[in-house]
A protein has these predicted regions:
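HhH-family (HhH-GPD) DNA N-glycosylase catalytic core used in base-excision repair
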Residues: 30-357
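Low-acidity, Ser/Thr- and Arg-rich intrinsically disordered low-complexity segments
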Residues: 4-26, 30
């Protein structure tokens, strides 16, 4: 499901249009909500290779809420590929089909002002509308529960992003398999900073964060076994990533397929199952019906929110979401964003740092 657990932030820092008076909790962050401060005057960029684009959503699009739309792409508060700036901008790096690129996007009234750098700049700007949810249709969602109606009303800026890239969501999703989110975030951060490339852009003097572009498939394939171990990644997850990067081109082709066929292609790779494929397709395709199954917490949260059943399993969750066929992922995200989760009654999953073995 979009987003993962992160520390609580101070109440009143919610994204514009997303109920800014509500605190950001672990559950709402898991729903894909990244606090983005109100926009301020932008700093001078001062770089010759910058490309720019302004995009205004069509009438009826709703408010442009960068924190809600782009939040699912962040892998922890120190993600080396994603950062929310103090000036209200969002920075994101991407290994595009044309090469590395850096995107900075900022809401300016009803419009989005974007700048991009690097070989992938043109591709990033071409894909900007899809990234900001232009291909999503929130009107197709009809709430059948009071909780969902309330949350949808409070989050009018919720649109599903479509990145058009597979590997950038697949690798961190594999790292999140069967471990705590802190462990997965740490592994992603260490591996990207060590084997990725510094993000193209104007540099820190223009307010650019210290960002990296994820490694190319060949670079992932050449990471030594001891470096996976040092990052806390066990052999099973490392082997899954290595199998995936060997067929990276075929996996990236999945963005041209309908979501069910795309998931089937991803699941041909041993180690990639329904949980991982759903996490990827939600982001790469902006697919509103790709609900995550096999998750440790989501069935309990959905069951508790819709039926008061904190012990619901996947089958019960899917039954409860049947009225939202075609929009089940959106329904699950709204539930997570509502913060309506069962009280914890057992300890958190124990963290196991295999790098110390």
């Amino acid at each position: 499901v979009a987003g993962r657990f992160a520390p609580r932030s101070t109440p009143g820092t919610g994204a514009p249009g997303g109920g800014s008076g509500s605190p950001t909790t672990r559950t709402t962050v898991r729903g894909g909500h990244v606090p983005v401060p109100a926009a301020r005057r932008a700093a001078a960029d001062g770089t010759a290779d910058m490309r720019q684009r302004s995009w205004t959503p069509p009438e009826g699009h709703g408010p442009l809420d960068l924190g809600l739309v782009l939040g699912p792409l962040r892998r922890g508060p120190a993600d080396p590929c994603f950062r929310a700036g103090r000036d209200g901008s969002v920075w994101r790096t991407c290994l595009t089909p044309l090469g590395p690129g850096t995107l900075r996007v900022r809401a300016s009234g009803p419009a989005a002002e974007a700048q991009a750098w690097g070989p992938g700049a043109a591709w990033l700007l071409d894909e900007l509308p899809a990234l900001l949810g232009a291909e999503d249709d929130p009107a197709a969602f009809v709430p059948r529960h009071r909780l969902l109606a309330h949350c949808a009303h409070r989050r009018p800026g919720l649109r599903l992003t479509r990145t058009g890239r597979v590997l950038e969501s697949l690798i961190p999703s594999v790292l999140e398999q069967k471990v705590t989110t802190d462990e997965a975030y740490r592994a992603w951060r260490l591996l990207v900073r060590r084997y990725g490339v510094p993000a193209p852009g104007p540099g820190p003097e223009a307010g650019m964060p210290d960002l990296y572009v994820m490694p190319e498939p060949r670079t992932w394939a050449l990471i030594p076994s001891w470096e996976w171990h040092r990052a806390g990644v066990d052999d099973k997850r490392a082997a899954t990533i290595l199998r995936a990067v060997r067929v990276a081109r075929r996996l990236e082709e999945a963005v041209t397929m309908p979501p069910p066929q795309a998931r089937a292609r991803l699941e041909l790779v041993p180690g990639i199952g329904p949980w991982t494929s759903a996490e990827v397709i939600q982001r790469s395709h902006g697919a509103p019906d790709e609900v995550t199954v096999g998750d440790l917490h989501l069935p309990h949260i959905v069951g508790y929110a819709l039926a008061g059943d904190r012990d619901a399993d996947d089958a019960a969750m899917l039954r409860l979401l049947e009225p939202y066929a075609g929009q089940r992922h959106r329904a699950a995200r709204l539930i997570l964003l509502s913060g309506h989760a069962p009280p914890r009654r057992r300890p958190k999953m124990r963290r196991t740092d295999i790098s110390k073995w």
